[in-house]
Amino acid sequence: MDALQEYSHNSFDLQCLLNSFPGDLEFKQIFSDIGEQMEQNAASIEHCIEEIQSEVNKLCPDAQLQTTSDCFKWLTSYNYNLSKSPSISHGDLINFLKTMKDLLNNEDNHEEMILDLLWDLSCQSSISFLSSLGGTTFCHLSRTSIHSVEDFSSVDVKSVWDDVRLHLRRFLVNRLERYNEINNSQQKIELKSQCMKQFLLLYSESEVLVKYQSIQKRLLDTFLQDSFPSCNRESDLERIVCGYQSTMLMLYSMIKEDFNVLCEILAPSSLVQFFNETYLDTVTEEMTKILEYFCELQFKENAVPVVKTSKSCNKRRGAVHALVSPECSQKERRPSLSLEELRFLSQLTESFVKLENSIQELFAETLSLLQMPRSSPGILEKSKKEVMVEKLIANENNKPPEALLPVKEATLLEFGWRNAFKEVPLAIAHCISAAIEGFSTQVLQQEQTERTSSVSYTINLVNVPQLCPEGHIFPEEEQPKRVAKFCSDIIEKLDTMLLLALACRDDSPQEIKENLVEAYSKVATAVLERLQERGKEVPSRAPLKNLHSILSSATYVSQRFTHYDNLMKETTKKPIFLVPVQRYQEFINTVQFQVTDYCARVCAMSILQDAESHHWDDYKAFYEGERCSFAIQMWHYFSLALHHDLWTILPPKLAQEILAEMLEKSLGLLASRYARAHPSPKRTAQIRLDVMAILIFTENMLWSICSSGQEILNPHKFNNHKIFKIHTHCNNLFTTLAILTSPLTELYKTFQHGVDESPSNSLTPLFNQPLHWISCMSQFYPSLLRPPSVGGLTAQGQLKLLLSQPCCKWNLLLDTLLHSGGLIPRILLKSSKQAAGMESKQSAGGSLVGAIFEVLYHCHLSSQTFGNVFMSHMEEEQLWDFLFNIPVSSFTESQPEVIHCLRLALMDSVKDTVQQIISIMRCRRNSETNLNKPRVPDHLLQSIPQGWNYIPRDSRGKESNKGITELAAQAVSIVLSKLPTVIACLPPTIKYFFFLSERKMSKNLAELKKAGLLVWNLIIIICRIFEDGNTVERLTGSSLDRWSKEKLGLICLCLESILGKQSNPSQLTQKVILSIERQKPNWMEQQLLKARTLSIQCAFTRMEENSGSEGEAALELTEQKTNAMVLDLCHKPGGSKYLQQIYHIMQLNEEYLKEQLFAMNGSEEKPLLIRPLKVALRDEDQPPAFNPFHVHKVVSESMLDQVATVTWCCDWSNLLPNYLGLNKMTFGALFKNRWEMRKDETLEEKEKMMLEHLKQNCTIQDFSTSDSKTEQ
């Protein structure tokens, strides 16, 4: 294929590796491909050197080059061997120039042809058309000595040449001005770049920049005058700010366009200098005028005088500074700015800061020689490498009307907009402290007024505003949800005013920063005092909910001030709000303790004090033994109410901590009380019912306070001691239930030989294992919480754990989606077709199907889930025909969303291949276009000096022109050669999916046997892209003309013929394929087979890896995999949004998902009723306030059927043996509280015998003796 790829070079896009986790097979293929491409590039370079060597030996007999080293040495010294170069006669040169001049003056539309001719002469013959400083004729770069004697006849040459290039300059200027009206940015950049290169043929770089700067400045001035909103006394400051913000965005787009035009043409120093004077100085001047006029309006009577704008002679041209006179500022009364006016200046500052940062990123990405130091933001300085400085080649007498750009060796990118604020900060500093303190005082007074006038003392809450990602320095689980309104109002203003301080740099007055820090500290103290004051009102005058609001508000203020500290550290280098943050943290800890302590005391001293329910000596059953104690029900309602308030107000992590601590303390109290209870026979059943109710309620709350599946299944392996203590208390309660309420006969059968206290070194007794009570409770309550020994969490349990959390946790969500082979995603996909409120033609990014696809598609470590989920979906929807022929157009009618997503994934994988082929087509098209341009007239060709050895374009075209056959063969070879690497870079999820699909479809489609389904679709996708001009333009930025479409059509026919899709290929198609076959026999079939084999092997390898782990080690590995996949997914574009969308829909359809999972787990197979999914929150779906009656209904229907629980029959023969290892002291203490141990109870002889036997074997005689003594 060397003949087809002459002077070619190949590249590999390593960016594709970031989209997947390649395995060993994939890496082997990728490195093999890189090695092959390096060999091809080396062969191409070697071939080029051989041709150069042959040409030199032919043209220069004296320099016979034998080796590559000789060739490089000759090329290095060639430019310096100038003495032998013959000079060009004056007559030939003046004849050539006059012929050009006559042609331009006497005939129309020859400018483009002349420019092309000059470009060819410059490239082919190394001719420079720029005048030297001495006024000599053209410099022949390779043949004319710089020491030639000056000839006065050069004045005529210079005069004629000036006329020619003046004519061409007018043509190019008009063209540049027309190009500014083009809307397509990419097209505008390409056309202007070409025009600038032509301009540089005629004039020096400095002269071209001056002319282009003049054009762009006129355009910029017009744009700013039309875009900037007017400022007067009646103007709305908010409207003005919005106008400036939109103008800055458009201004940046203009700067970016010019940067892309000039960055490859100019040296870095010239590039920076151009933007300094064209854009940045102009914007600074406009900023100065804005502030000057604003000051005149706001400070007309009492403002300090403002010096009118003037141009500084020792500064660059165009730099304008408006300064407030410092002498007058000390004499005159300082102005007073309102808070709204300060906010206007702050938002105006923000617009310029964003523009500055955007320009910084633009230059930092492209110009590696320049960098922006942190100590001097806004100025791009030189790196340690030297910046290239150009020397001007211009005649002093040949200066254009505009002043030439001065050349600086160390040109820096300077955005001096802050100079407009040079003295204005003195006025701002004077006002900002009073404005901030005055506003905060006003807000606090308003809060006090509302409190005194309101009937309720409940704090008015608002949702925490959503901040941009860079505004979050704390994870979501630590961010408050609702805060006091007065705190939110104050923080909103503080956020806005902070921008003024951040805009101050080291060279700016520090009064703003100092006064702002002082004012912020005072405001923080005032807010803290108000929160402390409101905290003291609980519980005497205000409800407990106020403590939650206070805790959340204090956390919010503390986090915002921590954020301020991080922002200010860039200039202050030290924390400036350390003291306020520490005081808030101490207050947060105090309030958190106050909340938990208050809840525990309420439970111990109020809720659980129930004399009627806990009258254990009563010989009358409590409500005939059909109800648990009132205290237990009230404790449950109180816990749920607390859960509701914590979940809706506090940061999620803090809410879980408080609820867990309250639950642990109250359970400890309950376990202690029930262990000391000594019930009568009629009240024993109540003890059993109470304990069962406590355990059921606790199990329901446990899902909310555990943040992961492993934490709820293996609490002893985590550092959360509260969770472990909760399990311990529940085990103690169940021990009390077993020993205290079990039938005496069953107790005797188990313990007739005594308890076994022998220590076991290998196993922990069952009753001490954390989840023992869960296993026992499963006999009367179907808990979703199952120990790891019996399989761990089911899909229902995973769903309940996820939706019980106070916020969306990505790891849990992904675990839930991947659980049971993607059971929940399959349910969602099945119901998505009937989703209520979903648009029928919604884009994949905004639909549920698209979100599920994107999430599972990037789960590279769980590729089987993606395959199983979407294979099931394809089968249910019967989409196999679409999969065999995926369309690329996004406007295809009735295109299923899954096919749409697959199309985008495959298109992204072949994008690099498409771009390479389109690049080849563009190069060929440009050469064809040049050949088809108007011919240079013969008399002009004859006037070209013979010494330049110019070869006309037509002659060169005949020598180097390639046929369409070779072009198509080269493009087809690129596609086939890249196929294995494209497959290697595909995520394993997509390879596994196509592997399963191929097994499903290959029975009926013989065409797939040749290439396989994945390879087939990749090639067909490439063909469909080439056929769709819109898709090509979107992927490559290039629009296709008729010539390109015809050539791409031929390439598509060739590829389809190779696949076997074309049964009767045309003669031209056969010719292309035969040309490839002659160069490399059987190479095409080998490439197809290689690509198919690689895709199958990769799929099998992933299957073996996924099925290789078992048991607990697999659970730990799964957690590690989940963390890795979540991290990767959140770094993908839109990854976190997809997760959030799926979580939101799962929340809205929680009950429906539970029903579906329950039905799928049932023993009987029954058809599932598919209902439309809710995808939007309706008014009736809004979370209501806590309603205990609704809770009672839910508990009675789904959690605790008290009547049924009373009749529960436990399998005591299996339960009691678990307690044989119980401590004798514990067993004795519980046994003596049984109703049979009461002195006044009447027992049968058999019961007395069993009782005495248990006393002796369990050594509890001391207990009975002490009891008798106590009674006496």
Swiss-Prot record:
Q: Name one Pfam family in it.
A: DUF4495
What is this protein's name? Answer: Uncharacterized protein KIAA0825 homolog
